[in-house]
Swiss-Prot record:
Its cofactor is [4Fe-4S] cluster. The keyword 4Fe-4S applies. Keywords: 4Fe-4S, Iron, Iron-sulfur, Metal-binding. One of its GO terms (biological process) is base-excision repair. This is Putative DNA repair glycosylase MJ1434. GO terms for molecular function: 4 iron, 4 sulfur cluster binding; catalytic activity, acting on DNA; hydrolase activity; metal ion binding. [4Fe-4S] cluster binds at residues 202, 208, 211, 217. PANTHER family: A/G-SPECIFIC ADENINE GLYCOSYLASE/ENDONUCLEASE III (PTHR10359), DNA REPAIR GLYCOSYLASE MJ1434-RELATED (PTHR10359:SF19). Binds 1 [4Fe-4S] cluster. InterPro entries: DNA_glycosylase (IPR011257), Endonuclease3_FeS-loop_motif (IPR003651), HhH-GPD_domain (IPR003265), HhH_base_excis_C (IPR023170). It comes from Methanocaldococcus jannaschii (strain ATCC 43067 / DSM 2661 / JAL-1 / JCM 10045 / NBRC 100440) (Methanococcus jannaschii). Belongs to the Nth/MutY family.
Amino acid sequence: MKENKFEMIYKIYKILLDYYGHQNWWPAETRYEVVVGAILTQNTSWKNVERAINNLKMEDLLEEVKILNVDEDKLKELIRPAGFYNLKAKRLKNVTKFIVENYGNTEEMAKTDKDTLILRAELLSINGVGKETADSILLYALDRESFVVDAYTKRMFSRLGVINEKAKYDEIKEIFEKNLPKDLEIYKEYHALIVEHCKKFCRKKALCDNCPIKEFCLSK
């Protein structure tokens, strides 16, 4: 099609929003719960994360200082449903320690006037926090305009011909941020819509027949 491939990005957002409606992602009662979820969701499904978070809620532990002070073995058992619980317990302690020592809590961190790129660099300096996790925390916990790229994003937009399937994380992130309005809610919704679309249609084995954006797709 003659349309610039990057111009598709915003058009596809509007089509997906019309098709699926608002996703209202991230489901959390507090900013810190988003941080916890961003760590726990690494390499697992959200259903498993929900089970782990519910365990923490049952023990009244979803606060920064409480997570810092809880025995690590107890924490491991509580987050076991999310998998890789030994690793994630350490990562959860690491990111929480950083927040408490530098900001007091996540609410205060969200109020800082530091530039988003500085905050991102701080998060990436924490052991166990990669780019997707850092951007998830920035976007959904701290309300910063930092687009989240995940495996679904790469799969879907390489099939659409917008990105090369070997494109690096920051390259993909930059393409989205340059071709979308700089709008917090659009960033939040679009990431969630991509996830939903890849679960419904753009699976590993794609279901193209009734896909709402198949007119744009090179793989159909």
